[in-house]
């Protein structure tokens, strides 16, 4: 009796030149940058001219790899990174991603005033009531 096994390729995000990263610590926290050069196992050289991130060596523990990539030659200068970034429409792709929308929603919720939080609570109650009413009717 033979069984066919299915081998699937891993779906990991690789540390590669041209990979877009989200910085989670430091002065540029919350901004996007691109990996320009891999220094060693734990450090990469990043550059984010459109987001205002200066070219710098950063520890991989301080960034999160995003699923976005674009073609970029190794060790590219800031002007090249800027042109390739714009050509690949990285900012638009990031803004359309659910990850960016979730971050924006989290920031919006954190900025709510007490009265706005109250309004959200009332609207959620109204929504819950209409859903219960529709389910009871069906």
UniProtKB/Swiss-Prot annotation:
Positions bearing N-acetylserine: 2
Cellular compartment(s): Cytoplasm
Pfam families: KOW, Ribosomal_L14e
Cited InterPro entries: KOW, Rib_uL2_dom2, Ribosomal_eL14, Ribosomal_eL14_dom, Translation_prot_SH3-like_sf
Gene3D superfamilies named among the record's database cross-references: 2.30.30.30, 6.10.250.2270
Chief site of localization: cytoplasm
The UniProt record lists the keyword NADP: no
Record PTM: N-terminally acetylated by acetyltransferase NatA.
Highest taxon in the source lineage: Eukaryota
Keywords, sorted A to Z: Acetylation, Cytoplasm, Ribonucleoprotein, Ribosomal protein
SUPFAM superfamilies (alphabetical): Translation proteins SH3-like domain (SSF50104)
Span of the signal peptide: none
GO molecular function per UniProt: RNA binding; structural constituent of ribosome
Keyword presence, Magnesium: no
Record GO biological process: cytoplasmic translation; macroautophagy; maturation of LSU-rRNA; ribosomal large subunit assembly; ribosomal large subunit biogenesis
GO CC annotation, single: nucleolus
CDD domains associated with the record: eL14 (cd23702)
Role played: Component of the ribosome, a large ribonucleoprotein complex responsible for the synthesis of proteins in the cell. The small ribosomal subunit (SSU) binds messenger RNAs (mRNAs) and translates the encoded message by selecting cognate aminoacyl-transfer RNA (tRNA) molecules. The large subunit (LSU) contains the ribosomal catalytic site termed the peptidyl transferase center (PTC), which catalyzes the formation of peptide bonds, thereby polymerizing the amino acids delivered by tRNAs into a polypeptide chain.
Note: Present with 45300 molecules/cell in log phase SD medium.
Assembly behavior: Component of the large ribosomal subunit (LSU). Mature yeast ribosomes consist of a small (40S) and a large (60S) subunit. The 40S small subunit contains 1 molecule of ribosomal RNA (18S rRNA) and 33 different proteins (encoded by 57 genes). The large 60S subunit contains 3 rRNA molecules (25S, 5.8S and 5S rRNA) and 46 different proteins (encoded by 81 genes).
Family: Belongs to the eukaryotic ribosomal protein eL14 family.
Protein name as catalogued: Large ribosomal subunit protein eL14A
Organism: Saccharomyces cerevisiae (strain ATCC 204508 / S288c)
């Amino acid at each position: 009796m033979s069984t066919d096994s299915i081998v699937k390729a891993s779906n990991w995000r690789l540390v590669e030149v041209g990979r877009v990263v989200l910085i989670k610590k430091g002065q540029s926290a919350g901004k996007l940058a691109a990996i320009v050069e891999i220094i060693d196992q734990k450090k990469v050289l990043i550059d984010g001219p459109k987001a205002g991130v200066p070219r710098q060596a950063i520890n991989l523990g301080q960034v999160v790899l995003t699923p976005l990539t674009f073609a970029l030659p190794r060790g590219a200068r800031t002007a090249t990174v800027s042109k390739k970034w714009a050509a690949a429409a990285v900012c638009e792709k990031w803004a359309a991603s659910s990850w960016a929308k979730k971050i924006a929603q989290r920031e919006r919720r954190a900025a709510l005033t007490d009265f706005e939080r109250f309004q959200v609570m009332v609207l959620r109650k109204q929504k819950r009531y209409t859903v219960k009413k529709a389910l009871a009717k069906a």
